[in-house]
Amino acid sequence: MNFTVGFKPLLGDAHSMDNLEKQLICPICLEMFSKPVVILPCQHNLCRKCANDVFQASNPLWQSRSSTTVSSGGRFRCPSCRHEVVLDRHGVYGLQRNLLVENIIDIYKQESSRPLHSKAEQHLMCEEHEDEKINIYCLSCEVPTCSLCKVFGAHKDCEVAPLPTIYKRQKSELSDGIAMLVAGNDRVQAVITQMEEVCQTIEENSRRQKQLLNQRFEGLCAVLEERKGELLQALAREQEEKLQRVRGLIRQYGDHLEASSKLVESAIQSMEEPQMALYLQQAKELINKVGTMSKVELAGRPEPGYERMDQFTVSVEHVAEMLRTIDFQPGTSGEEEDEEVAVEGEEGNAGPEEERTDGRESTGQH
């Protein structure tokens, strides 16, 4: 069935156009949305310029970069539902554009520019029966047709229905489809908003965990530095004690050597005395001194291996291996780890005291 196209478009009647226009009015400027149109997290729409004006009014201390650009950050309330809108660093330019509303505005303006009276005069005319209007719908072939085609034409054996009935039915179906599409777009926009919030949460949680990780390793480094200092001090004390002992022995041996050398020198000079009487006057005393000096017992020398310091060797291989096994613990938050570390610290502090107590009790029993 061929026919001449001349039917009214979906938005052709004035009542539908008026209803649609009401849905396209901005709640701020009370005029039709001007591009770009932004959608808020609460799913209401605003002209971006109007959103900028609302933001400026709600944040008087924030200055615009220019007449049309708002500073990043800040917040304001939706004029329709009073829901608080939090802006990111892009300001109102970070809000999503509602391309669906912008497209509907374009369609509305195109339809509004067409004369309604000329559209009302157009009709579908049957090409096989030129004087017959298309007034019925063939349900079997799913095409509009005329009454003559049903009576003795190509659709005489088909099931038909009044054209207005099918028109209302399919218009209702299309309207429902549009509503579902719009609702689906709203849901998609809501999901996008949620996922953007998830991205922000991921970034924030990652930043916090990085900070905690740095703190943990800085704490480990501090413990290692503290322990290294303690061990170095112990090594230095042992070194000083041994050096003092050995140097004391050196001084003692040196004093004995000096006294012995002087006595030897005196004895040699006495032996060179040619007069026997003078020699004998000094000989007895020198003989006694030499005998006494030879019997002096000096302090013992350091025992073999006294100079060794290998008892201060530290084995860190097992600690290094343990450090290499440090890994993340899924499901454990930073706060829980802090509590665990605090509990372990308290138990560690109590341990030595308990050991000392046990030691005293054991000593008492023996």
From Swiss-Prot:
Subcellular location: Cytoplasm, Cytoskeleton; Cytoplasm, Myofibril, Sarcomere, Z line
Keyword Metal-binding: yes
Zn-finger region bounds: RING-type: 26-82
Record's keyword terms, sorted: Coiled coil, Cytoplasm, Cytoskeleton, Developmental protein, Differentiation, Metal-binding, Microtubule, Zinc, Zinc-finger
Annotated region (Disordered), positions in chain: 326-366
PROSITE patterns linked to this entry: COS, ZF_BBOX, ZF_RING_1, ZF_RING_2
GO terms assigned for molecular function: ubiquitin protein ligase activity; zinc ion binding
Zinc fingers (B box-type) by residue: 121-163
Statement: the UniProt record of this protein carries the keyword Phosphoprotein: no
One annotated Gene Ontology cellular component of this protein: cytoplasm
Source taxon at top rank: Eukaryota
Record region (Mediates microtubule-binding and homooligomerization): 168-211
GO biological process per UniProt: cell differentiation; innate immune response
Major subcellular site: cytoplasm
Alphabetized PANTHER family for the sequence: E3 UBIQUITIN-PROTEIN LIGASE TRIM
Record protein name field: Tripartite motif-containing protein 54
Source species of the chain: Bos taurus (Bovine)
Organism lineage: Eukaryota, Metazoa, Chordata, Craniata, Vertebrata
Gene expressing this chain: TRIM54
